Amino acid sequence: MTVTAVNVLLSLGVAALAVAVWKAVVMVIQIATSPLRNIPGPPNSNWVYGNLKEIFAAENSVLHEGWVAKYGNTIKYKGWLSRNRLFTVDTRALNYILSHSNEYQKPALARYNLGEVLGEGLLIVEGEQHRQQRRIMNPAFGPAQIRELTEIFVEKAQKLCLFWRNEISKSGEPARIDVLNGLSKMTLDVIGLAGFNYEFDSLNIDGKPNELNQAFSVMFRSLEGFAIVFPLLKALIPPLRLIPDGRSRRIAKARKVMRRMGMELITKKKAEILRAAAGEKEKDNLQSRDLLTLLIKANLATDLPESHRLSDEDVLAQVPTFLVAGHETTSNATAWCLYALTQAPEVQQKLRDELWSIPTENPSMDELNELPYLEAVVRETMRVHAPVPSTIRVAMTDDVIPLDTPFVDVHGQVQDSIRVKKGDPIFIPILVINRSKALWGEDAFEFKPERWESVPDAVQHIPGVWANQMSFLGGPRACIGYRFSLIEMKALIFALVRAFEFELAVPPEEIIKKSTAVQRPLVRSEMVKGCQLPLLIKPYHTV
């Protein structure tokens, strides 16, 4: 090692140490002065991990629900390095937090780790940059646009049916199939075509992974494992980001591929749009209706103020954003739907009867939306098995959060609001709210699609963008693609439940939910295999 290299490393080490000491001092001051210290909650389990180890060891949200039962609607628990973290199920407080997106933003730690993989796309940016991106992207996710894309959803759902029929023909029926694997392939193919008219061809039995598919796989695996020690330290201590590691190199290589291919797509689409504007008639087909094309069209509109336009870099950042947001959540939600149907055979058959009541294998968006029991099954799946069980916000300024239900602080004083200090983290309990007995009744944990025939009045106060639940959040940062996801999910369930009968391949107690950013199924006795949902599948034969 040269003298120069040694000096550089020493300089980085000194800088990293200085930043670490400074951050430690700031954190100690925040812990000591945060108003959250006066809120009741569970005892600290560990100085370094706080209560996080026990949270990660438990099923998603189970521990939080126990804390609510013991300590009340508004509590605090300990996060990294014993930092206080606010947790409330008060719907007025949650509505306030979600509707004030400037004052309550994603934490810098999460933004860095996600941003390293995804770039500065809609999932990452905050404030005016987020509003600018969302303003341009909103039209691409409207009902009319999703209606045009439904054909892709149905086509790929039918291709998944063929994919599974091929597996059944090889092993006999019923065949044990990991449905999560097939659903992930299907949703990746959908977002490729519907997102930017690119064919991943994941469901092609004889196909080979293409370059963009491989790059996305590398980036997605990096997202799954971001909470390891060195990436965590790099997020907390910026000078460490200058030190390369294997994960960073893999991400950089994959992003280089994605950037090159993304810019090729953007350049091609811009040229096509400009040619059409110059007088060449553009073909009115699905190729011109993908989300990226619609985004570029909106961005090139002549009546759009220059200050509202996105740069090519901003447009490019939406490619990995589309892939991640439009792929993993829908595949997992549909997997949990199939799981729920195996645990309620009468619901599965009632749903199948409804799906066979319409005389087509290629339903439109309107036909899918006119099936009431399918709607109820999707709503109940998203309520009980929310793909994203929680999220985090950080107070960007000192503030006072209003409450519906007062709490008694550690000094015995009744408080009708929550005081927070700049930097205080806040846990947003999506799944806890979705299955709160106080809101939904004593059967809140049960999968009962019939509940949607008459929902309790209390759920009207839940601050969600859809169906009186928080699965797609609410406020200015509510999921922009929720209509896309719901119609894709309906198309999948329509095709699969018409075509097959499903049973769980292992005892129900073997299925557990992995506590990650997205709620994934695992088999308790087969953890080494990673996320999977093995079902016994056989073709359904009409009488």
From Swiss-Prot:
It is a single-pass membrane protein. Heme binds at residue 479. Its main location: membrane. The keyword 4Fe-4S does not apply. Keywords: Glycoprotein, Heme, Iron, Membrane, Metal-binding, Monooxygenase, Oxidoreductase, Transmembrane, Transmembrane helix. The keyword Nuclease does not apply. Pathway: Secondary metabolite biosynthesis. SUPFAM superfamilies: Cytochrome P450. It is an enzyme of class 1 (oxidoreductase). Glycans are attached at residues 332, 434. Its EC number is 1.-.-.-. It holds the Pfam family p450. It is found in: Membrane. One of its GO terms (cellular component) is membrane. Its cofactor is heme. GO terms for molecular function: heme binding; iron ion binding; monooxygenase activity; oxidoreductase activity, acting on paired donors, with incorporation or reduction of molecular oxygen. Belongs to the cytochrome P450 family. PANTHER family: CYTOCHROME P450, CYTOCHROME P450 12A4, MITOCHONDRIAL-RELATED. This is Cytochrome P450 monooxygenase 169. It comes from Postia placenta (strain ATCC 44394 / Madison 698-R).
